[in-house]
Structure formats: structure tokens, C-alpha cells
């Protein structure tokens, strides 16, 4: 990976861990927090979206791009809702690592199916990252058994991980179509920001429509009540994934970007201990070592 791409992903990890702390603080809001945060990002980026479409031309973008965008938006919503609901049942330090690291192996496998190659050391790095994330939720090494992961919180974290896997692979393919279509007019960085904005709209519109159709207007009211904290999280969410999307334009294999993003697990753990007074255990320390070792192995041959 390019050194600039690595720097962008690492900085995005700091922001990602930060908005997860805000999400934990408002875990009881569930879908409302996710909706409010996503909508704030939509409104922030809408003027840019209009400028981009006027500059590039609506008809320039292929229909396949819009189809991938819709699917990616739904996958993002699955991830966000799964994550926030999981926080109702467990610590940030438990849920965050599982939801973020499990997709490493999943995206790696999908990348292979799409024709990308991975070295043995990179696969070993993926395994270490995944093992590290499995250790982090435990309070003791004797708990490293299947029973420790059979609970509602981890189940929702798995749902979030599936969402992450989906949008990570789809976004890379959609970005490729977008940059090819707009490449003669605007550079890749402009297209990455545009994709970020339209993706947020693809996330939030289905949820708002669902609330209206089902008569669940309480979620809309709750979203309004927590708009200040959610807006801050929305800005962080937009900044976080915008940096990742830009990094994706600099590398062919999205699995490397996904693996590097797991440094946010370490940051999330530290923030959970510092800001939310969550406990630190030896297992979490061991998990952090495995995660960092896995990242080094993954990038060593990248």
C-alpha cells in the first residue's frame, strides 16, 4: 500500500473509534442515533453532491454504479444498526473489535474470488487479527471457549460484520466505475467524496421511509432529541469513511485496507477504558499484540 493510503486509513481509525464512543453513550437510542448521525452527514455533503453532478453530468454515471450504491447503502445500514443494538448488550471493548475484525477474513476470501492475490504472510496476518479480536472481549484466558461468544451482543456484532463485508467489497467496485466515468473531468479524490455523500443518502432514506410506513414515528422524534451528539458523530462518520474511500482509490486490493482499519480496535479499547471507565484485562492486552502483529504482517508484503 502507498504510504499516503496507510496514513489516511490510520487517521480515519482515530475518528472511527471516536464516533463509536459517542454511539455507546447513546446506545439506548438505537436506530434513532444511527439515523440522526447519517442524516447530518447527508445534509453536510449535499451541496457538494449537486456541484459534482453538475460538473460531471448525471448521464455520465452508469446504471450499474447506482445499483451498487443502493446495495452498499443497505449494507452500511445493517452494519450501523447491528453495531448500535449490540452496544445495548455489551461494552464497546467487547463489540467493537468483533464487528470490525471479523470482516478481515471475509473480505480476504471475497477478494480472492474477485481475482486478487494474497501472500501466505498476509493470510497469517488476517488470522492473527481475527484471533486478537476474539481475545479482546474476554476477562480471562480460560474463557476462550465457544460458549463465551454465544450471546446476543456478539450475535449483533456478527450482523454488523456481515454488513461491513458487504459494503467494503461493493464500495471498491462502485468506486472503480465512478472514477472511470468521471476520470476525464475530476480526480479520484473528488469522486471519493461524492460517493461518500450519495452513500449516506442511500443509508438514511430507507430507514426514514421504514419509520414512516410502519408508523414508528417515535424513532424520528428520538433522532431529533439527540441531534446535537448525533450530528457530531455524523461528521466523524463522514470524515472516517471518506478517508477510507480515498485510500481505496490508491490500492487494488480492498482487503489490505480492511485489515489496516483494524488498528481502530486498539484505539477503541483505549478510548473505552479512558472515557467510559471500561475495564482492562490481560486478554485485551494479548489481543492488541496479536492485532498489531497481524497488521504488520499484512502490510509487510503489500
Regions found by a protein language model. Name each.
Residues 167-176, 249:
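Extracytoplasmic gate region of multi-pass secondary transporters
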Residues 13-17, 46, 73-81, 101-109, ...:
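Hydrophobic/small/kink-forming positions within alpha-helical transmembrane segments
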Amino acid at each position: 500500500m502507498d504510504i499516503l493510503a496507510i496514513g489516511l486509513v490510520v487517521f480515519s481509525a482515530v475518528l472511527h473509534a471516536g464516533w463509536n464512543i459517542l454511539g455507546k453513550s447513546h446506545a439506548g437510542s438505537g436506530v434513532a442515533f444511527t439515523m440522526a448521525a447519517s442524516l447530518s452527514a447527508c445534509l453536510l455533503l449535499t451541496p457538494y453532491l449537486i456541484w459534482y453532478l453538475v460538473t460531471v453530468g448525471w448521464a455520465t454515471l452508469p446504471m450499474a454504479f447506482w445499483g451498487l450504491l443502493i446495495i452498499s447503502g443497505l449494507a452500511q445500514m445493517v452494519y450501523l444498526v447491528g453495531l448500535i443494538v449490540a452496544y445495548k448488550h455489551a461494552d464497546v471493548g467487547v463489540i467493537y473489535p468483533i464487528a470490525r475484525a471479523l470482516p478481515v477474513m471475509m473480505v480476504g476470501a471475497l477478494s480472492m474470488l474477485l481475482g486478487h492475490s494474497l501472500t501466505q504472510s498476509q493470510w497469517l496476518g488476517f488470522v492473527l487479527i481475527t484471533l486478537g479480536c476474539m481475545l479482546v472481549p474476554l476477562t480471562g484466558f480460560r474463557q476462550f471457549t465457544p460458549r463465551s461468544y454465544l450471546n446476543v451482543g456478539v450475535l449483533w456484532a456478527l450482523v454488523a460484520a456481515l454488513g461491513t463485508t458487504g459494503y467494503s467489497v461493493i464500495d471498491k467496485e462502485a468506486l472503480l466505475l465512478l472514477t472511470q466515468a468521471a476520470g476525464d473531468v475530476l480526480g479520484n479524490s473528488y469522486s471519493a467524496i461524492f460517493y461518500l455523500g450519495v452513500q449516506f443518502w442511500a443509508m438514511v432514506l430507507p430507514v426514514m421511509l421504514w419509520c414512516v410506513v410502519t408508523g414508528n414515528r417515535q424513532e424520528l422524534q428520538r433522532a431529533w432529541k439527540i441531534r446535537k451528539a448525533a450530528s457530531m458523530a455524523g461528521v466523524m462518520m463522514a470524515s472516517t469513511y471518506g478517508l477510507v474511500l480515498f485510500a481505496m482509490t490508491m490500492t487494488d486490493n480492498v482487503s489490505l485496507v480492511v485489515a489496516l482499519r483494524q488498528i481502530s480496535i486498539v484505539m477503541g479499547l483505549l478510548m473505552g477504558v479512558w472515557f467510559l471507565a471500561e475495564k482492562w484485562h490481560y486478554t485485551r492486552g494479548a489481543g492488541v499484540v496479536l492485532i498489531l502483529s497481524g497488521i504488520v504482517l499484512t502490510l509487510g508484503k503489500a
